[in-house]
Amino acid sequence: MNGLVFDIAHMLAGGLVLVSMMMLYQDRLYALLNVFALHSLVLTLSVAWQAFVQDAPHLYVTAAIALVFKAIIIPVALHRMIRQLGIHREIETVVGIGPTMLAGIGLVALAMVVMLRVTPEANPLAREDLAFALSVLLLGLLVMITRRNAVSQVVGFMPLENGLVLAATGAKGMPLVVEISVAFSILIAFIVIGVFLFRIRERFDTVDVRALDDFKGRRRK
């Protein structure tokens, strides 16, 4: 039974890393949003499984929060925002997909080596989850760094919190009040970012961050 528990937890956490890798090669905003929704769904399953393994009922609520807000509400709202803004659907990247994927593989390997070496005495399941969580965090940062479009950078930010939740639940859960506060903080940040994107669109007729850099350069002159 313990082997089965470990295998399922390992599969779900590894699936989260795999979906994070999928985000790296998406070249259209709608596809990126759909992959983020899948990312949050896999997180929901992982947290729910940890709730079962640890006999921690509050983690079921955490899983429900991830499902409702991250897998449904936020992706749907961003889909509507893209339509209303008339944003260009294709994503411009700083570097090509090939180098980005290679960098992603390198970051995953780095996360595994670092985390497994610094937690030799930890529970094997917790060690794996922490290593996978660090991989998700690093891949989310890579998505943000390699995208020019502000919306795609916002989507790259969202998996960072998913990685934090995976780490916390793998390390014997987290207080429900913390997860609720994090969820509401993300929603508030999402609303602010939405308003900000509308203002960018009104002012510059684009949400490409290069337009902001050009504007700042002109002001300095």
Name each region found by the language model.
Residues 1-221:
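Alpha-helical transmembrane segments of multi-pass membrane proteins predominantly involved
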